């Protein structure tokens, strides 16, 4: 992380008077830089409640913020992995609404007032959070999914001016209907001021390398939109995950992300869309720790690889095109992630 005054995690600078992100272009090779990664996502505002608490929040005394300093200078900390939900969207799920929220401590706090969230952020030395909503609507029909996404994105856009210096957001997409997702992404970026989208690691088992999703990736590349990949476990392994330890989460979630990224690499999707900005949750799952195995797969077993797909570089080198949050739990885990992918590809993420 740079020690430059007002420098954010994406390498850009924030104008404190406007809350807008100013990013200077970078030259160089294919590797995307953090400076260009979020492209204004940090300037998108959001609040966490849908109960009209903005005025009350502004009337509250501002809590002291714990600063982070490097070399004696304040470093702006941007958390790219932080969650919230909207009651209005969950209400559209009907009888399945009670299955949306994950069974973890603190979930009711996803429905919180802004001043409470700010106090928590200040206590953690987080200057800015980029909000995302894990997809829970991929199994819904077109009209219901569209309504859920509309509610969520409209609310993010409607409330974006409340605290633009503290909050940003990734939009929601109905990826099960790629043509609709393209429209939603374009609206989110061009009309609603959002700069990316949060997506699952597949759409009910349909991998993102499937050509049906190419129009979505093409639009994201065109718009410079960030795609935040967050896992939803691997339900096809539910039988093996039974037992103690919540294995569907501890193993299933990172595995889900790993599979998603490997398909994007091995099916040539990242070659087809070299400018695609993909951010993987939880340090990219297991991929960074075992990427070198992929370099040998087609060499030792060519019959299991498609001769019509000629990758432009070694599979492990595609890690330089991907971004990873730092949600790996330990300092040693973070050191390992840095050693595998490089500090330039790692973003601050807390899973708050």
Language model features with spans:
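Helix-coil boundary/capping segments in enzymes
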Residues: 3-5, 14-15, 19-352
């Amino acid at each position: 992380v740079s020690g430059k005054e007002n420098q954010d995690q994406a390498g850009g600078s924030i104008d404190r008077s406007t809350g807008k992100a100013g990013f200077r272009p970078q030259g160089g090779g294919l590797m995307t830089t953090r400076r260009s990664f979020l492209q204004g996502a940090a300037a998108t505002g959001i609040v966490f409640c849908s109960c009209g608490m903005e005025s009350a929040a502004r009337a509250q005394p501002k809590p002291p913020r714990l600063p982070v300093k490097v070399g004696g200078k304040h470093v702006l900390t941007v958390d790219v992995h932080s969650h919230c939900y909207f009651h209005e969207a969950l209400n559209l799920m009907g009888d399945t609404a009670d299955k949306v929220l994950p069974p973890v401590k603190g979930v009711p706090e996803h429905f919180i007032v802004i001043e409470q969230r700010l106090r928590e952020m200040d206590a953690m030395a987080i200057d800015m959070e980029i909000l995302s909503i894990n997809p829970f609507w991929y199994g819904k029909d077109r009209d219901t999914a569209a309504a859920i996404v509309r509610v969520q994105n409209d609310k993010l856009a409607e409330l974006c001016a409340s605290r633009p210096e503290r909050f940003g957001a990734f939009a929601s997409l109905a990826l099960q209907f790629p043509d609709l997702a393209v429209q939603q992404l374009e609206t989110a970026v061009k009309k609603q001021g959002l700069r990316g989208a949060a997506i699952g690691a597949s759409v009910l088992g349909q991998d993102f390398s499937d050509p049906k999703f190419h129009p979505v990736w093409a639009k994201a590349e065109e718009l410079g939109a960030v795609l935040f990949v967050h896992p939803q476990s691997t339900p096809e392994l539910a039988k093996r995950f039974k037992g103690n330890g919540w294995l569907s989460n501890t193993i299933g979630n990172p595995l889900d992300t790993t599979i998603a990224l490997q398909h994007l690499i091995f099916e040539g999707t990242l070659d087809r869309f070299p400018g695609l900005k993909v951010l993987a949750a939880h340090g990219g799952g297991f991929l960074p720790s075992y990427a070198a195995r992929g370099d040998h797969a087609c060499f030792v077993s060519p019959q299991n690889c498609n001769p019509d797909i000629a990758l432009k570089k070694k599979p492990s080198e595609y890690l330089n095109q991907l971004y990873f949050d730092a949600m790996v739990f330990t300092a040693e885990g973070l050191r390992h992630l840095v050693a595998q992918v490089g500090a330039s590809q790692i973003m601050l993420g807390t899973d708050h």
